[in-house]
């Protein structure tokens, strides 16, 4: 009689089942991951817009609540948080200030760097009463 040898290892079928399970889990988890990444980037934009809003309001107080003297980042004492490959390559939005005599609009537009969609925007409009209207085309324009 011959001696039986113990064989160890996985069969091809077991390996294929594990690969299929991992693939299914990844297909469920990846869209959620990308959604959370975009949500965090939209939060970045809202924080920058909020800081800009406060700086414009502080600047306008110096000019009897007239916003026309506060239309650039230099005039409000801020560095433009827009994407610049040499200074802040991590920024995911470009920013613009639109100024009227008694109101202003701040716009964050998603950069196409890192697969952003250039048509995604977040807009804050501050009217004469100081009320802030949030709008935009990105899925997270209305996040609180």
Listing of model-derived features with the role each one plays in the protein:
Residues 1-10:
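N-terminal leader/signal peptides at the extreme start of proteins
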Residues 11, 28, 36:
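Ser/Thr-glycine-rich phosphate-binding loops at phosphate-binding pockets of nucleotides
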Residues 30, 35, 72-75:
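Phosphate-coordinating loops and pocket residues in cytosolic domains that bind phosphorylated ligands
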Residues 35-65:
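Membrane-proximal N-terminal amphipathic helix
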Residues 58-144:
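Periplasmic/extracellular, small/polar-rich flexible segments of pilin-like filament-forming proteins
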